[in-house]
Structures are given as C-alpha cells and as structure tokens.
A protein has these predicted regions:
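Substrate-binding/access-modulating region of protease and related hydrolase catalytic domains
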Residues: 16, 53-55, 116-119, 131-134, ...
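Hydrolase catalytic cores
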Residues: 125-128, 149-154, 311-383
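C-terminal subdomain of the subtilisin-like protease fold in secreted/lumenal serine endopeptidases
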Residues: 36, 43, 174, 183-185, ...
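Outer membrane beta-barrel translocator domains of Type V secretion systems
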Residues: 665-757
Length: 757
C-alpha cells in the first residue's frame, strides 16, 4: 500500500450547477477538475464534452473499503459496500488474525497494520469515480456507481503467495462478479521479496524478471481451485466471465517487472483480453514531461496488456483517524501504481458508456490501441501501449490487434482473442449479456448508429454484426478483411482491406475501399444519400446480390467507381428516389422519364450483366445498358409496346397508332401512365370507335320488343288471345312490361358487348 504525502480537508458544495458544455472541453476544466492533474493528462475533458462520464456503469473497487459516507461520494447509492464473510485461510503476521478465524466485511473502515484507519480504498475510489459536484476534486468516471468489496489486506506486499487470504479474496471476487460490476480495479498484488528490493535502482543487483514471476506462478498454479488459492482463482474466473480486470503493476522501481498477480494473464493467456496491468506516470510539473514514476515497476513481460496512467501525487478522498470514533474525512495526495490503476478503471467505465454495445475485452482494446505512445516506438517494456488517452479513445479503436502486431519480445501465444473485431450494433432496446449479472438493456441511440473517426491500423479485420449502422470516417489501414454480415457499414473515410457484403448486410458510404464483393443476399448502397463509393481494386457482384441505387431529378445518382475491373455475375439493381428506401413509384418514374445515370465505372473493364432491374411498370420502368467500362441506368419507356397488351384487331390497330404518337401528346401520355393492361385496353376501346357500332346493333336488336308488344295487343283485338270480352261502351287500359338482356360475343377482330333494357 502507499503513503499519504499531504492531507487537505475539503467540503462539498451545498448546491451545484454544471458549467461544462457539450462540445467545449475547456468548459469542463473547473477547479474541481484541475485539482486532480491526472484528468487533464488523460484528456478526460474531451470525453465529458462529448457527453460521456461513466453514467450507468458499475465499477468495482477491490481494496480496503470505499468509505461511502465521505462527502466525495454523496448521493443515493453512489457507493455500494458489499458484505462478504467466511473463515480465514491464512494467519497474517501484520494484523491479529489467524487461519480458522471468522471474517465479515461490510464497508466499515478497518485498521491498517500501522494502527490507522485504512484509507487506501477510499482514495482509489475517489480517483476512479468521485462525484463532480463542486467539491474538492472529482474522479474520472464521476457518474459511475462504485461497488466496493474489501480484500482485508493491510499490507505490506511481501512476495508471499498465500499472504493474499484465499477465503477472503474469493468471497470478494465472487461478490463483485455477482453484483454486475463490469470492471474491477485491483490496487494490490503479491509483491516481490527483499532479494530484489535490496538492489534498488542499481543495475548491478538482481531484479525481478519474467522468470521470477514464473516461479511465483508455479506456486500459484499448485493451489488454483483450492481455498488457499482463492485470490488467484477468483481473479481468473472474473476475467473469464468478461469483467475487465485491472491490476497495478507494482511499486518496485523501473528495473523490476510486475509480480505474477499483475501478470497473471501472461501465464493464463485466455484471460488476457479482459486484463490490464498499469504502470505509473509522474506529474510533469515536477519532471517537465510525462515519464514513468521512479517508484513504478515497468510493464515488462506484461507489456502487450499494459498501459500507463498518472500515479504520482494524485489528489483524492481519504479518511483519517485510529477508530470510528475519531474518524475524519478529507483529501490527500498519494503516489503509487495504486493511484494509476483507478485512472484506467474510470476510463474503462467512461468508454463502456461511450460504446454500450462493445464487450469488456473490446473496450480494453480501444483503450490500449488509442494510448499515446511513450518511450520506444510502439509497445515497449516501460510504458506498454503508452499513456491512456480518453480524448482519442472515444473515437473508436486505433488498431485491430492480432499476434502479428505484438513485438516478439512481449508476445504471449493465445492472448489476443479472435483476429476479427466483431462490432455488433444490436439496435436500441436490445438486451445485452442476457442471463449474466451484467445483463442490461441497450437503450442508447449508439446501439443503432455510431461513428468511428480514428485511423485504424493493425493486422486484424472488422466484422459488422447487428441491425444498426456503423460509420467509419478515418483512413483505415487494417490488413484483415471487412465483413458486413448484418446491418449497414458506411465507409466515408477509407478502408484498404477487402470488403465483403454477406447475406443481410449493406455496405455504403462515399469513401474508398480496397476491393468490393457483394455475395448472395448482400446489398451495396453507395453514398449516405446520393454518393460515390470508390474501390481501389476490383468489384464483384455474385448471383443473388443487390445493388441499391438512389437517383435524383438533377441527373445525379449513386455510383461505384473502380480503379480495377467489375465482374457482374447476376443480381438485381433496385432503383429508389433520393432519400427513399422504396422502389420508384410509377409517378416517380414518369417524373424522371428520359434520365440516364452512370451507376458503375471500372477502369479495367466490365464483364457480365445483372439479372434484373427494378422497378418496371406496364409501359414505364428502368433499364440497363452496358459499355466496356461502365453500366448506365435509364429511366423511361420500357420494351412493352402498347399493342402487346391489346386483345383485338381493333385495339391493336389503335394501340399501334397511339404508340407512334410523339411524347407529350395527351393520348400517348394517357396510355403511357396506365397502371394495368386492363386500363390500357379500356383506353383502346374508347379510341377504336367500336362503341358506335355496338350501340346501333343493340338498338336494332332491342326495337323488336316494342314491335312484338304492339302486335300482341292487336291480336287481342281480334279475339285471338283475349281472355275476356271488352264491351263497346266501356273504357279500357292496356299495359305490358318489357325487358331484355343482350350479350354479343367478341372475336379476334372486335370485342363483345352486353346490353340490358
């Protein structure tokens, strides 16, 4: 544990008005911000100005208890102190406890081996997530919730493996994981023996190496899975569960490597993606520049999962006194990698809010790959990846890491996860980590749409999953493939890798890609509305793929522009109006009549054709023409003639005559806009004149009914059909109802008709 250099009291403001403004980092640099120099060093103000403060994130502190009643943690449930209990496994020579004793921790401050109340956890908690409320200082993730579990460790760290009581630590690990904490900060370790401490900074003396750490791990390995090994098994289990597990590198000087606790992921490589070790940096006001603290252990063999953060003279919350009766609260400056680690923990919390859809391992990769390089170029033995930089990290990863990106000196086989960085934007409202203690609803709009602006390098590849949209605006040189499996990937910057759109995926944007392949079910939709997607290499459309083209009335359209060749093996071209997701309506097609659009150009030539183009209506639609180096889309008359939908010779004659009329003729335009063949045939009948002959025929035919009625009445007068005699001196009346239904069949020459009287 570390030494308090100065203690300064402070009180929280009774009411607080936030003066920090969105988009203005300088507005966040209040006196409260400036009191903790580490915040400015890691560019936390840029994260705050972008709207990210760790809100909604549970941040675990495994240490001496964080004193929840300290005014730095004012507010409901700002600090949750977990209760752990059990039977001890170790007799500690520094405090009066022995193996077999019962223990119970509930957040009540405990007494250190020097007789004073343990303030270490409270100081660490303030750095990680102290509240921003106008008080003396605030932490990195000031809106995060602290979950505190006590490790019962009064110090010192003496290199004894069993000294970290297996029962006490395992209870704490299990409680923290069960609480839903996504991050666990550990500002403690095993330590190294006096053999190495005696050497100080003299290179002539022995110093702690990876081989010495291996000897420690050999002892640890023997007790994994047992009660005495709970401190180590618990750490492994936490990291395996997906919790980002952070360890201070140690305070043994720049010539010593971290102990096997901070370096546990080196020996258990599968947990390395969720593991971070942390070296300490000095306050530049004392040194003129950021550099490793003189007391800090180097990153050493942990370099590929190690970062550096402020750890010298860090101002944060403390408690003082020798008992609860004389406990007081205040603030003090402490130094140590114990102070560096919570800067990292708070930063991870901020990034978890920033990237709610990323796993803990992915957030850790973002933090590592955006660190400011220090010391020797790239990953080095002193600083690891370098000093964490929240201002850059909020813009996405800086590298997609595989083993090929790690210097051989620091390479740990099997420690870097999959070669594809899978970005799953599941959509707003999706449930994440279902069934785990960290289960949560992704309620942020970022789960549906996010922008990454960093330039991304590395040997890994990018896989887009989920229904949401990811937009890349940087100049990306990562070497692995870009796979769009679901949702939309918009490339507005550049990607030098090969881009492949799978079934259910959409690729778009107005940037440049290395090559482009659209597979069955995949869609290419250039632009962000209308725009051009540039391809440095070749383009390929496979059978069943789709090319979605937006067009505008001004002659502009989406376009693919390739410096290589274009191979079209089928698929469909679907045409929509600008800013619409639906195919062109008939009226929209009519409004674009005569327009032509260059939708694909390839300097090395175009081969093959698309299977279809949509939409197509009765007489209007879209069509494609192919040139040696391009494909042109035309909007206008399709190949369906007016006469082809006519049914009779009369209709065909009229249809052919109408088809020969010039565009703009009202008869031609009326037929052109017919929605169905039936509508067109009705127009042909009206124009053919057949109705006049049909009326004459019907009138002649129907006239017989009146004639027959009169003749029938005359026959009555002759007595031929009268049922009763009518006297000469009587009046009479005669009435008869007439009705008829006529039908005339048509033939190839003329249509039939129906009539009723």
């Amino acid at each position: 544990m570390l030494i308090c250099l100065t203690a300064i009291g402070g009180a929280q403001a009774s009411s607080y008005i936030e003066n920090g403004q969105a988009g203005d980092p300088a507005s966040w640099r209040s006196s409260e911000f400036n009191a903790e120099w580490g915040l400015g060093a890691i560019h936390a103000d840029q994260a705050y100005a972008a709207g990210y403060t760790g809100k909604g994130i549970k941040l675990g502190i495994f240490d001496q208890p964080v004193y929840a009643k300290h005014p730095e943690f004012a507010g409901e449930n700002k600090v949750i102190n977990l209760v752990t209990e059990g039977i001890r496994e170790y007799t500690d020579p520094y405090i009066p406890v022995k193996k077999g004793d019962a223990f119970r921790y509930d957040g009540t401050p405990s007494v250190d081996s020097d007789g004073t109340l343990g303030s270490h956890g409270t100081h660490v908690g303030g750095i990680a997530a102290g509240s921003r409320d106008g008080g003396a200082m605030h932490g990195v993730a000031f809106n995060a919730q602290i979950i505190s579990a006590e490790n019962g460790d009064p110090g010192p760290e003496d290199g004894i493996i069993l000294g970290n009581d297996g029962a006490v630590y395992k209870a704490g690990w299990d409680a923290l994981v069960a609480s839903g904490a996504r991050i666990i900060n550990n500002s403690w370790g095993i330590g190294i023996t006096e053999k190495f401490d005696e050497g100080g900074y003299d290179p002539a003396y022995p110093h702690f190496t990876v081989n010495d750490a291996q000897k420690q791990f050999d002892q640890i390995k023997q007790i994994l899975g047992t009660k005495p090994g709970g401190a180590y098994q618990g750490a492994i289990d936490a990291a395996r569960s997906g919790v980002v597990t952070i360890f201070a590198a140690g305070n043994d000087g720049n010539l010593n490597n971290p102990d096997a606790m901070a370096g546990l992921a080196y020996f258990v490589p599968e947990i390395a993606p969720n593991w971070l070790s942390v070296a300490s940096l000095q306050d530049p006001t004392n040194t003129g520049d950021y550099s490793i603290s003189t007391f800090s252990s180097r990153c050493g063999y942990t370099a590929s999962f190690c970062v550096s953060a402020p750890g010298t003279r860090v101002y944060s919350s403390v408690i003082e006194g020798t008992s609860l009766e004389n406990l007081t609260t205040g603030y003090a400056k402490y130094s140590g990698t114990s102070m560096a680690a919570p800067h990292v923990a708070g930063s991870v919390a901020v990034l978890m809010e920033r990237f709610p859809y990323l796993s803990g391992a992915q957030v850790a990769e973002v933090l590592k790959t955006t660190a400011t390089d220090m010391g020797a170029p790239g990953i080095d033995a002193l600083y690891g990846w370098g000093m964490i930089n929240l201002g850059k990290a909020i813009n996405g990863p800086g590298m997609l890491v595989t083993e090929q990106d790690i210097p051989e000196e620091f390479l740990v086989n099997g420690a870097y996860g999959p070669t594809q960085f899978v970005v799953d934007l599941p959509g707003v409202g999706a449930v994440l980590d279902k069934g785990k203690p960290t289960e949560r609803v992704c309620s942020d709009v970022l789960c549906g749409l996010d922008f990454w602006s960093n330039d991304i390098s590395g040997h890994g590849g990018l896989t887009k999953q989920g229904i949401g949209t990811l937009v890349l605006t940087g100049n990306n040189t990562y070497a692995g493939p870009t796979l769009v499996n679901q949702g939309r990937l918009a490339i507005n910057g550049s990607v030098t890798s090969d881009v492949s759109v799978q079934n259910g995926g959409i690729v778009g944007g107005s940037g440049t890609v290395g090559s482009l392949t659209a597979r069955r079910g995949g869609t290419v939709a250039p632009g962000n509305s209308i725009g051009t997607l540039n391809v440095a290499g070749n383009v390929s459309f496979e059978p069943g793929s789709r090319y979605a083209v937006e067009v505008g009335p001004n002659g502009q359209s989406d376009r693919i522009q390739s410096s290589g060749s274009a191979t079209i093996g089928g698929g469909e071209v679907a045409v929509t109006l600008e800013n619409s997701s639906n195919l062109l309506t008939q009226s929209e097609v009519r409004s674009l009549l005569g327009q032509q659009y260059n939708i694909l150009t390839a300097q090395q030539g175009v081969s093959g054709q698309f299977d279809a183009v949509a939409p197509n209506y009765l007489f209007l639609g879209t069509g494609l023409s192919y040139q040696p180096n391009g494909v042109t889309l035309s909007v206008g008359r399709n190949g369906t003639s007016f006469a082809s939908v006519a049914q009779t010779a009369n209709e065909r004659a009229v249809a052919a005559a109408a088809d020969a009329l010039a565009a703009g003729n009202p008869v031609y335009e009326s037929i052109l806009n017919s929605g169905t063949a039936g509508e067109a045939r009705q127009a042909f009948r009206q124009l053919s004149g057949q109705i006049h002959a049909d009326i004459a025929s019907a009138l002649v035919n129907d006239s017989r009914y009146l004639r027959e009625a009169l003749n029938g009445r005359l026959r009555q007068a002759e007595g031929l059909a009268s049922s009763s005699a009518i006297k000469a001196d009587e009046d009479g009346a005669w009435a008869q109802l007439l009705g008829a239904w006529d039908h005339a069949s048509g033939d190839a020459n003329a249509t039939g008709y129906q009539a009723s009287t």
